[in-house]
């Protein structure tokens, strides 16, 4: 794709006036900057492995583009101090979400782009019982201090034409025949369970924000495809079918009920305000991951056949006495087995 020449004053004036226009005329209070990686590197970050700081700060860095982004975030917050600026940057540029006065670029949040890529890779490559839980923990918890990250399971990169949503990868063709509430099969039951667990563990280990994407909160089955020459300019897939979740006879409503309860849980226990996640137990053979955060114990069983009854878990210094189950993905109201 073509990029702007950020070294020209006329270009900078045009882009900044565009931001101001949307804020003042339409009262926009949030901006997501797409393709930031392509902007800030002269090679657009293509084929680059960002494994060291020399990859971030070199002659390949487009200083003029970085300066424009600093001006843009400064302007956004000058017009509305409560406005939010989010960067989509797959390179992990240091300082992206630090204030400009500290040498940063000034964004409020960055998207945790490695997380959805991790989930798709795991789903495509191996059975859930053999997922690498150590890698899962690393992907969901590794972030720079003082930089706010938005956790999410999937976005347009997964849901657009040419790829599949998480639920479609899990259930495949049975999405079209097996979503009646009265129907059960190993494929559908496993897909429903994993879809809930993937969302919950991603939210639980997010520290700054959590993002739902256009229907993944109820497991929308199909991709998004905007009208174009290749599809005869059809609007057929340029939609999200909320009627699926509103229909009380389908499992989509159970997935949505889970999402609603999960978000209420996150608000009640201030999950996004806690930064003290501690890995308590990883058992690769049993496919069990357990951790503490904010005084709560989270236990996830990713094994597709072992229900891990009478499982003993060392909780260390989190607390003493008895523990109560305050939230479970296996409730019947959520499509579980109780």
Regions found by a protein language model. Give the residues of each.
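Short acidic-aromatic active-site loops that bind/stabilize oxyanions
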Residues: 4-8, 188, 248-252
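Catalytic cores of secreted or luminal carbohydrate-active enzymes
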Residues: 237, 241-271
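Conserved alpha/beta catalytic core and glycan-binding cleft of carbohydrate-active enzymes
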Residues: 27-29, 44-229, 235, 267-278, ...
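Substrate-binding/active-site clefts of carbohydrate-active enzymes
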Residues: 1-61
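Alpha-helical packing segments of well-folded alpha/beta enzyme cores
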Residues: 11-22, 68, 72, 194-201, ...
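Acidic glycine-/aspartate-rich tracts in secreted/extracellular proteins
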Residues: 330-331
């Amino acid at each position: 794709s073509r990029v702007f020449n950020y070294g020209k004053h006329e270009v900078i004036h045009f882009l900044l006036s565009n931001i101001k226009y949307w804020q003042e005329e339409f009262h926009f209070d949030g901006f997501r900057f797409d393709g930031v990686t392509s902007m800030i590197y002269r090679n657009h970050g293509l084929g680059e492995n960002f494994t060291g700081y020399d990859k971030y700060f070199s002659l390949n860095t487009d200083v003029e583009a970085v300066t424009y982004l600093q001006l843009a975030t400064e302007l956004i917050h000058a017009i509305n101090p409560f406005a939010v600026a989010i960067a989509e940057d797959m390179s992990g540029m240091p300082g992206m979400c630090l204030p400009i006065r500290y040498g940063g670029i000034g964004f409020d949040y960055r998207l945790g782009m490695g997380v959805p890529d991790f989930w798709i890779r795991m789903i495509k490559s191996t059975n859930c019982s053999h997922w690498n839980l150590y890698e899962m923990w690393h992907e969901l918890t590794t972030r720079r201090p003082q930089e706010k990250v938005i956790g999410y399971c999937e976005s347009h990169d997964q849901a657009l034409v040419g790829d599949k949503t998480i639920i479609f990868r899990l259930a495949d063709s049975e999405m079209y025949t097996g979503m009646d509430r009265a129907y059960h099969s190993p494929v559908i039951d496993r897909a429903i369970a994993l879809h809930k667990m993937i969302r919950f563990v991603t939210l639980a280990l997010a520290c700054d924000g959590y993002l739902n994407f256009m229907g993944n909160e109820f497991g929308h089955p199909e991709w998004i495809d905007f009208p174009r020459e290749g599809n005869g300019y059809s609007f057929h897939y340029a939609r999200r079918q909320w009627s699926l979740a509103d229909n009380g006879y389908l499992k989509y409503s159970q997935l949505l009920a889970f999402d609603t309860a999960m978000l209420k849980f996150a608000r009640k226990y201030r999950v996004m305000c806690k930064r003290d996640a501690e890995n308590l137990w990883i058992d690769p053979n049993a496919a069990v991951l357990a951790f503490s955060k904010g005084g709560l114990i989270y236990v996830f069983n990713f094994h597709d056949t072992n229900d891990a009854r009478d499982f003993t878990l060392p909780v260390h210094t989190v607390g003493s006495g008895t523990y109560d189950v305050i939230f479970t993905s296996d409730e019947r109201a959520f499509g579980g087995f109780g």
